[in-house]
């Protein structure tokens, strides 16, 4: 029994070591960025989408020897939020850390791919310009939460496993403005979650082979 357990442990350790070596040896680094369209539901009234951008770095960590499945963590600057009428702006800027499971549809150099995973975002600054109400400013009930969580996923196409184009959607699960629940506004959505939703396009370039 002891020999069986020892043998099983050695086999498991060997497999884990091989997997770790594969991941470290073949991890590739890249850059990513593009435009985005963001809205915050049930928050400011009136509310319109904001068009902005994101950009950062990624790591492509292999999970198999066929170069088809990966973990892809990213670190990005993400500019999002919403707009109001005229020059009214409610901008939230984050350091965003999505962690994707990524799968290519084929083993070929050119291939469609899909990705999905959690996205963690940490607020670095907030800009409120010409708010529709004096209470919407960040020093009062309009202050944005310092952490935003979302589920993120999308589709893309890879050219030679280097240059990639993609589209993704972030479905917010956090309430961006937790204090924005004042009934004086007359808005029936005022007590609902102020979740952020972001639709993005992007391009990435992955270095190495």
Q: Which residue stretches match the model-derived regions?
A:
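Glycine- and aromatic-enriched membrane insertion/assembly motifs of diderm outer-membrane
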Residues: 24-30, 36-39, 46-91
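Transmembrane beta-barrel domains of outer membrane proteins
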Residues: 21, 58-62, 100-104, 154-158, ...
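Outer-membrane beta-barrel translocator domains and adjoining extracellular loop/strand segments
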Residues: 41-46, 83-88, 126-134, 177-184
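Outer-membrane beta-barrel "beta-signal"
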Residues: 193-209
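Membrane-embedded beta-strand positions of outer-membrane beta-barrel proteins
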Residues: 29-33, 71-75, 99, 114-116, ...
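Transmembrane beta-strands of outer-membrane beta-barrel pores
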Residues: 35-39, 61, 77-81, 93, ...
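Repeated loop/turn-to-beta-strand initiation elements of outer-membrane beta-barrel proteins
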Residues: 66-69, 109, 161-165
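Residues that define the transmembrane beta-barrel architecture of outer-membrane proteins
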Residues: 25-27, 47-53, 91-97, 145-151, ...
């Amino acid at each position: 029994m002891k020999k069986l357990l020892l043998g099983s442990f050695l086999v498991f350790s060997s497999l884990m070591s091989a997997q770790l070596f594969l991941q470290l040896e073949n991890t590739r680094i890249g850059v990513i960025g593009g435009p985005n369209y963001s809205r915050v539901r049930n928050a400011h009234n009136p509310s319109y989408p904001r068009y902005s951008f994101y950009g950062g770095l990624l790591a492509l960590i292999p999970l198999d020897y066929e170069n088809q499945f990966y973990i892809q963590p990213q670190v990005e600057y993400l500019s999002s939020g919403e707009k109001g009428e005229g020059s009214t702006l409610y901008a939230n800027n984050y350091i965003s850390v999505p962690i994707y499971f990524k799968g290519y549809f084929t083993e070929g150099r050119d291939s469609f791919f899909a990705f999905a995973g959690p996205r963690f975002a940490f607020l670095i600054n907030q800009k409120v310009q010409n708010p529709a109400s004096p209470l919407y400013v960040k020093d009062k009930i309009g202050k944005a939460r310092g952490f935003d969580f979302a589920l993120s996923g999308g589709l893309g196409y890879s050219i030679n496993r280097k240059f990639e184009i993609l589209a993704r959607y972030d479905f917010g699960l956090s309430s961006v403005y937790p204090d924005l629940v004042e009934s004086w506004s007359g808005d029936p959505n005022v007590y609902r979650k102020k979740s952020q939703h972001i639709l993005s396009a992007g391009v990435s370039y992955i270095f190495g082979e």
